[in-house]
């Protein structure tokens, strides 16, 4: 290794690559890589990566980490940068015999001691692909390739065992961080070691956490037998059911954590979302929705509140809801929900937790991303004064062909008794039950799942369902039997009585196909009926609110 210092970068590089990293190259590395025949494979706000032809037939992998704001700059005054950490762990791992792409160099660029960028360079593995791509492209679920898949699973188990035996804990051990070379005969390479650590020994908890990460990343491809093959190669020939169950619980926990993290992307800068300040407001919006349009729609909402309050869908001290037309001649409608912080206590609470409007914005985007709800959220806008939230607005598309569930049921099934109507009603109940089942199976819980908070519309071949009043939605949470019972009671107590006992039992059967719970069906029905009798049935009809007795068998 030789020391290198050029264009503000300082670090180490292998002697045979010293002439490659000149000042001109490092001065604008992204442009230099492309001009030199390289290829950028990742480019984001915090990381850039590319392959670049080196001396002879060698190909280099160059990764640049960018410091995210002043907090990271201060942190890396005391801790090694991501590139330096990956360099140290890679060298130590290779000494222990772990298969890692050969490190070439590490460099940092600092200003007044504060880190701005860091580079990690390694040799690229010729013809290598992530294990996930290998499964997707060549295996899938094709039984004719089963032996090839089992061989790869054994190789994964053997590789992970070797990694753990040498004390390496990778905090992000998913299948995309394992590279398989041509044919896989040379074994698997572990990459992205900036989140890895070398320890004297790994506890069973850390080992199982890594295995759960791996299983979660291959969830679409692994069956129970495949997991047994993995554990056999890992060194546990007889996998106890309790051990496998523990790994699966950890995988579910990882899934819920990823969902919560992914849902918050709508609060950050990305290719889909942006955030900025506009006229004293803090705006979070989709990039295809202009800030000017948002301000026009909020202005139209205020106009209705001040001059035409009878047009409001809801008007209470805490929330005001209106329906406005989108600007610039669009035929679409937008639902604007305004949250007021009228009391001092409400303003204080807003300092310590997300506002209801922001909760709705995050939940709506996650439901839309997963295809659970078809309504597209447009923006969340808030205004604060002296650090205290004063008001906020949540804007979401609201097509005119959607109806609240209770209104749709009355319109479609209240007066029909023909065979076609009965078949249509049964098909509707099946689709509705599966929609609620998918909601819960996706670790999403709606705390106020009355039918007036569910929208329905017909489409060719079925129905679309969407959810509103999303400030009571919890993401990444296990929907327990207690929470399931709560939602089923809310639905049961807001459905008109002309849907009989048989219809409701069919709904439950189809729901349990998607989201089974550890409770006997008979006990669940009994519990739903008992809780429903305490509340009574209330739903909205064209004539107003209707109250009925709870149906019994």
What residue spans do the PLM features occupy?
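Juxta-kinase regulatory segment immediately upstream of eukaryotic protein kinase catalytic domains
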Residues: 1-37, 248-311
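Conserved ATP-binding subdomain of kinase catalytic cores across diverse folds
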Residues: 20-136, 142-143, 155-166, 170-171, ...
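Short, glycine/acidic-enriched loop or turn micro-motifs at the edges of active sites
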Residues: 126, 175, 195, 451, ...
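Short alpha-helical scaffold element within the canonical Hanks-type protein kinase domain
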Residues: 149-153, 425-429
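Hydrophobic residue at the +6 position relative to the catalytic HRD Asp in the kinase catalytic loop
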Residues: 173-180, 449-456
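Activation-loop N-terminal segment of eukaryotic-like protein kinases
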Residues: 180-185, 456-462
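C-lobe/activation-segment region of protein kinase-like
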Residues: 189-253, 257, 463-534
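Terminal substrate-recognition subdomain of acyl/acetyltransferases
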Residues: 240-245, 249-278, 517-519, 530-553
